[in-house]
Each structure stands twice: as structure tokens, then as C-alpha cells.
Amino acid sequence: MSYTLDSLGNPSAYRRVTETRSSFSRISGSPSSGFRSQSWSRGSPSTVSSSYKRSALAPRLTYSSAMLSSAESSLDFSQSSSLLDGGSGPGGDYKLSRSNEKEQIQGLNDRFAGYIEKVHYLEQQNKEIEAEIQALRQKQASHAQLGDAYDQEIRELRATLEMVNHEKAQVQLDSDHLEEDIHRLKERFEEEARLRDDTEAAIRALRKDIEESSLVKVELDKKVQSLQDEVAFLRSNHEEEVADLLAQIQASHITVERKDYLKTDISTALKEIRSQLESHSDQNMHQAEEWFKCRYAKLTEAAEQNKEAIRSAKEEIAEYRRQLQSKSIELESVRGTKESLERQLSDIEERHNHDLSSYQDTIQQLENELRGTKWEMARHLREYQDLLNVKMALDIEIAAYRKLLEGEETRFSTFAGSITGPLYTHRQPSIAISSKIQKTKVEAPKLKVQHKFVEEIIEETKVEDEKSEMEEALTAITEELAVSVKEEVKEEEAEEKEEKEEAEEEVVAAKKSPVKATAPELKEEEGEKEEEEGQEEEEEEEEAAKSDQAEEGGSEKEGSSEKEEGEQEEEGETEAEGEGEEAAAEAKEEKKMEEKAEEVAPKEELAAEAKVEKPEKAKSPVAKSPTTKSPTAKSPEAKSPEAKSPTAKSPTAKSPVAKSPTAKSPEAKSPEAKSPTAKSPTAKSPAAKSPAPKSPVEEVKPKAEAGAEKGEQKEKVEEEKKEAKESPKEEKAEKKEEKPKDVPEKKKAESPVKAESPVKEEVPAKPVKVSPEKEAKEEEKPQEKEKEKEKVEEVGGKEEGGLKESRKEDIAINGEVEGKEEEQETKEKGSGGEEEKGVVTNGLDVSPGDEKKGGDKSEEKVVVTKMVEKITSEGGDGATKYITKSVTVTQKVEEHEETFEEKLVSTKKVEKVTSHAIVKEVTQSD
């Protein structure tokens, strides 16, 4: 561990002294200093280094360039020792070494004073930052008081609003009661009007009857009058005749006598006639009266009957009208009640929505404040960590100077004895310093653990923000997709998913925090890699660009490989009897590889397995097709883990239809949990057993197998054309997700284009020297972490049941299965009887056994060969294009004497890529 000399001006003054110690020669201008004071923020590379640069102005003004030049010329121990060797005599050498020692002590004292001033300045700056934190806390407290006051006012206003609403409802009820009274009065008025109309109608009917009876009476009166006139006429005629007869009789006596006799007869006759006529007239009158009375009685009876019927009909009509009015009144009252209830409901809904929005705003504000507080805490932890690193560096240098002073004292005491004594004392402190540097390098990861978890919390908060921003769009799209999915698939798979997902989610939730604790270490090593391997990173970016082009060109091939893998997995249970022994052998080999390779993150694998099982269940039955019965499905190459693409269970392949839009939205299973960055290079112990670097001859043998598999691959392409067209959007999302991976990681995990490609890759290992203390400490870590992993695997074994293939695919996601298969094939074909077990850490083989082979000087060669086979199928004419690209990267690393270089290839974790993957999943759902 070293400390930056940028504040003292030119760093070459100290670099020349510490050429033999490579760990002291780092400059703080890069994003990661010697003690790994790397920034966590994505915007600025290093906040702490910038603060040191600002603080460096004061020490620069204090010390002059002459002092620096004197320190520059006096700190070279090798030059002083050579001067001691080549001096003319013991007295002159002693004086020269004495003056040089004084200058060295002067320079060291000046530097130590500069360090002390820098420490004082940093303490003062820490106090200022604490004062700012206190002010911010007081400001937040004042904001909280204002919020309480506003809440009180809002509560009062809501209480008044409730009172006003209550009064309004009371007035509304009063108005409803008044309306009911008005309706009742109107009903009574209408009923009285109806009664009046009925009486008037009865009066009119009686008047009509009176008129009819009067008409009949008039007719009868006319008949009586005519009969009386006739009787009078007949009587007058009769009297005239009688008078004529009497006149004739009076003419003669005889006649008179005869006339008298006749007269008596006539009078009697007249009397008889009169009596007869009267009797006839009376009889006629009597008959007429009887007929009239009979007729009148019949009419009156008919009128009475009709009146009763009319009255009953009128009563029924009136009753119906009353019922209709009562029902209409009830309907109006119910309608008014309904309207009032609807208004109250709308008011309550508006109030609820307003409260909900206010609560959401408050929650958002609190989340933002919490996020800001977390960032502040992370920043303060970073500063605290950097100060601890500075303190440790100062303690180391103070101890080194103390050793130097003790060595000088012993040299002065033994100077009279021999001239070789000072040479030994000069070399002894350097050895002690280098050993301490190695120890501090080994102990450095322990200090990093303090701020790893804080950074992961911040990243998790960002993922939740992305989830909250896209929640509405995702829920709408999942609802639309839920309509289009068949109901039978839902009924068959719903019960199995609910039972298994509950147990899986519990395990994932329980193991989530230790998984994420390893992620931030990648960013520190990423910065360290950018400083140490600039040239190698440019070559890797070129390879990544080429692999991305190959991925885009082979999107159809990727989709077909995903479909076929899904079919093989779904029919894996039915073929379990035939393939049981092979699956058991593969499972044992996987466990061995996991125990050696996954030492830091065993729990993360279980979380990834739990998440891999879910998309396997969520796959629709469309994937069941006879293509799994192809000859390649049972060939040795098809059963190798290479045939199972690491992207076959990518997070974008999940079907959000079978799950509720809210409880199991695709964000809940964020690809960040499965991100390959969790497999940091430091997770794999350099002390593990590793094979020797593989010769290029072993690379050629898997390529020879590629030609044999190409013939079988052509047969698959025709069957997979239709299936490949259905999943282009999933492939784009998978490409987006794999872009942040570095090139050596891609060679192990394989891009989606290589999912069905017969081409296999060999990543030769590069031995890197590791100090014995580091090896001893890192050998203890796998034993503890293997115990934790066994406990986690026991819990995961109950959840997985019989799904062994999902475990294989999970290992393939982390980029391990393919490396294992390559090692097995090279053992069988190239190595013969040798049995080698090792862990390839992102293309680097850390083999401590090779440290002593080269002696003081060793040369290491890394040859990385990548072959990408792109198969493009055109749907129109059925033509198929085969494009093969190969990229070879060769690098040599030389090591001298006690120096060692640790080349670690770390994966880049970019959260923007994760969010893009989610967006592509949304377009796929559309």
C-alpha cells in the first residue's frame, strides 16, 4: 500500500527511490490510487483525490523545489551504496555517507512534516464536513417542523371541509323532505280534482238520462194529444150526425114518434158507443202507461248496471293512478338518494385520490431524502476509508523510517568493523517494507467490505426507482398479454407456480443481502484494471464490438437455440429414465467445480437458481415440438453444457403473463441479481488448484469437433426458422444485457450467437505470482464459504425438486459450465493420463506452483482465441449464410526479481444496460 506524492510536486522524486518496490510507485492521478481510494459515483472519477489535489496547494507553497531536488538526489539507496563501495578511503566514504544521511534525514523530516500538515488539514476539513452535516440535519429538522405545521393546517381544513359537507348533506336532506311534502300535496290536489271530475261526469250522465226521459214524455204527450184530438173530432162528427137525424125526425109527427123511438135507440146507442170508446181509450191509455213504465224500468236497470261497471272501472283507474303516483314518488326519492350517494362517493373518491397522491408524493420525497442520505453516508464512508488508508500508509512509512533509523544506528555501531555492514543494513529495511506492503495488500479486501454493502444498497435503490417509473407501462402491457394467453395454460401451471415460487422467493429474499455484498468490489478492481491494463482493455473493446456485431447478425439463430433449449428442458423430465446416469455424473462434476470456483458468492448462485426456475415454468407449451427428437439432442455434444446457452434463461425470457402484473412484475426479478458482475475475479481464490497453462494444440482439438457439429447444425436450421422469428426481441434484450461483459468473460459464458454454435473456445491460463501470505490467507476462505454453500444448497435442493437442468443453466449464466466442459475435453484428448483440476478466473490461471519455475525472472504468455459462428437464415428463399469470425489476442508479461504484477479482468457493471434490458422486454410484450 502506498500514498500519493502528488501534493509534494513531482512524483518522480519518490518513484526513483522505490523502483525496487512496485507497490510504492503508483500515482494518484488515475481513478484508483495505491490504496484503492476509488470513487463510487459514476459522474466524478475520484472525489477524495480531488480534495487532496485542492489541499495540495498549501504544501506546495511551503516547500521549495530545492528541497525536493535534495530529497530526489538523496533518497536513492542504491546510489549511496555504490558511492560507499567506490569511495577512495574509509574516512572520505564515511564523511560522504554522513552528509548523504543528513540530507536524507532532512528530506524525510520535511516529508513527515508535510504529512503531518496534511493530516491536520484533513482533520480540519473533517470538522467542517461534520459542521455541514449538523447544519443539514438542523435544516431537515426545521423542514420537518414546517411539515407538521402544514399537516396541522391541512387537518383543520379537512375538518372544516367535512363540516361543510355535513351541512350540505343536511340541507340536501331538508330539501328532499320538502320535495316529498310538495309531492304529497300535489297528489292530494290531483285526487280531489279526480273526484270532482267523477261527480261532474255523473251529473252529466244523469242530465242525459233526464233529457232522454223528457223526450219520451214529450212523445207520449203528443200521442195523448193526438188521441184526444181524434176523440174530439169523432165526437163532433157524431154530434153532427145526431143533429141531422134529429132535424129529419122533427119534420113529421110520425116521424117524430118514430124519431123519438129512434131517438131513444140512438141515445142508448151513443151511450154504448161512448162507453165503448172510453173503455177503448182507457185501455189504450193503460197499455201506453204500462209500456212506458216497462220501458223506463228497463232503461233504468241498464243505466244502473252500466253505472256500476263504470264506477268500478273508474275506481280501478283511480287506484292504479294512485299506485303509479306513489311508485313514481318513491322512484324520484330513490333517484335523489342515489344521486346524493353518488355525489358523496365521488367526493370521497376525489378526497381519497388526493390523499393517495399526497401520500405518494410524501413517499417519493422521503425516498429521495433516504437516497440522498445513503449517498452522503457512502461518501462519508469512502472518505473515512480513504483516511484509514492514509493513516495506514503513514503508519507503514513511519515504521519504515524507524527501521531505517535503527538500521543506521546499527550501521554506525558496526561501521568500524567492515564496509559491507551498511550495505546489508540498507537492504534489510527494503525487504521489511516489501513484506509489509504485501501484507497490507492482502489485508486490503477486509477494509473494502465496510463500504461494499453501502454501494449495493444504493444500486438496489436505483433498480427500485426504475421499477416505480415503469410500473404503469408494465402493468398495462401485462394485462393486455393476459388476455391473449390461453386459459388452459393458466389453469395447469398456476398451482405449481404458486407453491414453488413462494418457497423460492423466501430463499431469494433471505440470501439477497450477502449476495449483493460482493458486487461493489468489481468497480474498484475495474478502476485498477483501467490503470494497469490500458492497452489490453482497448483490444478487449475491439473484440467486444466484433462480438456485438456477430450477436446482432445471428439473432435468428439465437432465437431458435432458445426455443430448442426450452423444449429440451421441458421434455427433460420424461427422458430422465434414459439419461439418469449421465445427469447424475454431470451434477457431481458441477458440484466439484462449484466448490472450487464459486467461493465468495455461493448464495448468489442459489438466488440465481431460484430465479432461473421461474422462467422455465413460465414457458408456454408452444415450445413442445418434435425438434427435441433430432439426432443432435442425443449426441455427446448436445448433452454438454455448451448446448445449453447461458442466455437461454436470461431475465428477458421470462413470461410476465402467467404472473400477476403487480406481485410478480419483471422488475421484481431484475437482471441485476443475475448480472455476471456478481462473479468478481477476487471471488475465485488464487490459491485454488489450477492446471498449467494449456498449449495451443489443445485449442485446435475443440475446433476440430466444430466441423463435425456443423453438419448436424445445418439440419436444425430448417426446423428452427419458424421458431427463430418469434423471439427477436428477447435476443435484443439479451444482447443488451451481455454488452457490459469483458471479453474473457464472454469467452466463458458465450454470447447468444454461440448458443448452438459447434465452435468451442480455449482460454489458456496465465500464471500470476502471488505472495505466500496472500496464498495462506485465501486458502482459509474456501473452507468457510464451502460450508455456507452446503447449507444453502440443502435449502435449494428442496425447492428445485427434480429440475437439475435449471441448475446447469444457472451455472451457465455465471460463465462456468462451458469452461468446465472445455477442460474435460482437453483432459480426455490432449492431456492423456494427466488429471488436472483448476479454476480459470476470467481467462487467468492463478497457479502458485509455477512461481518458482522461472526463478527471479519469468515470462508469461496469454493467448485468447475467440471464434464466432454466425448463422443467418433468410425466410424468403430459405437460403442460409455461414459467417465465421476469429479474434486472437496475445499478451506477454515479464516479471523481475521480487516484483509481481497481478492482472485481473473484472466485469463491468452498468445499471443503464439493465434498464435497457427491461425496456426491450416491454417491447417484446407489445
Curated annotation (Swiss-Prot):
- Annotated region (17 X 5 AA approximate tandem repeats of K-S-P-[TVEA]-[AKETP]) at 512-698
Q: Does the keyword Magnesium apply?
A: no
Query: What is the residue range of the signal peptide feature?
Result: none
Biased composition range(s): Polar residues = 1-10
A biological process (GO) of this protein is: neurofilament bundle assembly
Keyword Repeat set for record: yes
Glycan attachment residues as annotated in the record: 47
What protein name applies here? Neurofilament medium polypeptide
UniProt source species:
Bos taurus (Bovine)
Lineage of the organism: Eukaryota, Metazoa, Chordata, Craniata, Vertebrata
The record's gene field reads NEFM
